[in-house]
A protein has these predicted regions:
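Surface-exposed, charge/polar-rich loops and edge strands
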Residues: 1-220
Length: 220
């Protein structure tokens, strides 16, 4: 369902008893190319290419990327006021994982303009929390379509992609776990010896161990 007028939206995600509130908006590909939208992962070209094909075929952003921004008191207050006083347009719990999803429309033009002004003048950067390949692909699609449009002015829809932007004080960094199912023909001792070629491997006991510093990993 497409609104007749441009709006911003508030998205609340509830999981494990915690709720975080983000703003659904469009991000500009130039902000990514110019480093205002900051990444912390290297991306693979084949994955970017795959996502570009999807965007070009559907001509849509079907899933928002997840950005974080330094929390801003005035934005927090505006979001809180809408959440407490306005009726959400959608409110449901997903059967698959039990997560709650709630959406509000920001209708007031003055509020929309003020939020845009704060992000333009007072928020120095956005940070990609999830969606590095989708962000890179969206920026590349914008560049390609710009190159093919002699009348490009920067306001075309292909310059933008959908994002949900959460304040950093509502985020929780959780474990990023991966399972090694196959040692590729190596014994456990040989596998650990191979790791020693690149890492310093130390035994730390039999209890759960969480990394405590940069470039440290735990393995079981």
């Amino acid at each position: 369902v497409q609104d007749e007028e441009e709006k911003l939206y508030i998205y609340a995600q509830t999981m494990d008893g915690r709720t975080r509130y983000g703003i659904v908006a469009c991000a500009h590909s130039e902000d990514y190319m110019n480093g205002i939208i900051k990444k912390h992962e290297l991306t693979r070209k084949d994955k970017e290419d795959d996502r570009m094909i999807h965007v070009n075929i559907t001509n849509a952003n079907v899933e928002p990327v997840f950005f974080a921004y330094p929390a801003h008191k005035e934005i927090d207050q505006m979001v809180d006021n809408i959440v407490k006083n306005e009726k959400p347009i959608y409110d449901f719990v997903a059967k698959e994982d039990g997560f709650g999803h709630t959406f509000w429309v920001i209708e007031d033009e003055a509020t929309i303009k003020r939020i845009e002004e704060i992000f333009e003048k007072e928020i120095p950067a956005l940070y990609v929390a999830d969606g590095h390949h989708r962000t890179a692909a969206a920026a590349r699609v914008g560049q390609e379509r710009r190159a093919g449009n002699p009348n490009h002015n920067g306001n075309e829809e292909y310059n933008y992609f959908m994002a949900v932007i959460f304040p950093d004080n509502q985020l929780k960094i959780i474990d990023y776990n991966r399972v090694v199912k196959d040692l590729n023909g190596l014994s456990e001792e040989e596998f650990l010896a191979k790791l020693n070629d690149t890492f310093v491997v130390e035994k730390v006991g039999t209890e759960i161990y969480k990394p405590s510093k940069l470039h440290e990993f735990s393995m079981y």
